[in-house]
């Protein structure tokens, strides 16, 4: 087959449809982009896709946004990421991976060397999950873009992400938010670690926060903080 891109976004293919797609991925060698966002693929579908990824060598971009996936599905996908060498872009946003799912993804990031873009926004990851991802960022050298917004990561989670950037040489695009005034004092001491970033988006810090942190994100005369 010569098909390289397949977009099934919001087509209600369900678990059975996802399993059928997974079976195809096991033998297909041409598809590079697959969008299965908002399809209610359920646990069986997600696990089947993850299993297929372990042997697939062509897929570069995979979107699994909004499929009501939980920690078990995240664990399965993380297992695939530990052995898959081709996936570069993975969208797991708007699911319910929770902190346990974040733990699994973090473990995968410590050994994965191909993923460059990861979306984990709106996954109820919270503070402990953020700390795990931060630890992974200290050793991961491939990730360039990370969307971590809307996860209620708190001061400790935010500070952990900030501190990890001092060790990470590759990340240049980071989306976080919900950094409120009580967190600003705690984050101020880490603002110098943000120097590698070219983009810091979705930071809900307001005018006070801009005065504290804003200057840290002006790189080569380009200020890219988005204040909502």
Predicted regions, residues:
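Leucine-rich tandem repeat or coiled-coil scaffolds
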Residues: 1-228
């Amino acid at each position: 087959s010569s098909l390289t891109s397949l977009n099934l976004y919001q087509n209600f293919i369900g678990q059975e449809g996802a399993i059928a797609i997974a079976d195809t991925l096991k033998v297909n060698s041409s598809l590079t982009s697959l969008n299965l966002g908002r399809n209610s693929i359920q646990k069986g579908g997600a696990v089947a896709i993850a299993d297929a990824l372990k042997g697939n060598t062509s897929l570069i971009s995979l979107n699994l946004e909004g499929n009501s996936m939980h920690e078990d599905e995240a664990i399965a996908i993380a297992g695939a990421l530990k052995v898959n060498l081709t996936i570069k872009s993975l969208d797991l946003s708007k699911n319910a991976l929770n902190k346990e799912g974040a733990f699994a993804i973090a473990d995968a990031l410590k050994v994965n060397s191909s993923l460059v873009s990861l979306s984990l926004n709106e996954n109820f990851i919270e503070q402990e999950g953020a700390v795990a991802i931060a630890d992974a960022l200290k050793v991961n050298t491939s990730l360039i873009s990370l969307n971590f917004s809307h996860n209620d990561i708190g001061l400790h989670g935010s500070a952990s992400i900030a501190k990890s950037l001092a060790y990470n040489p590759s990340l240049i695009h980071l989306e976080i938010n919900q950094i409120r005034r009580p967190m600003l004092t705690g984050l101020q001491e880490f603002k110098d670690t943000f120097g590698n970033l070219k983009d810091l988006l979705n930071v809900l810090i307001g005018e006070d926060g801009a005065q504290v942190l804003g200057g840290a994100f002006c790189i080569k005369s380009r200020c890219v903080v988005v204040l909502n």
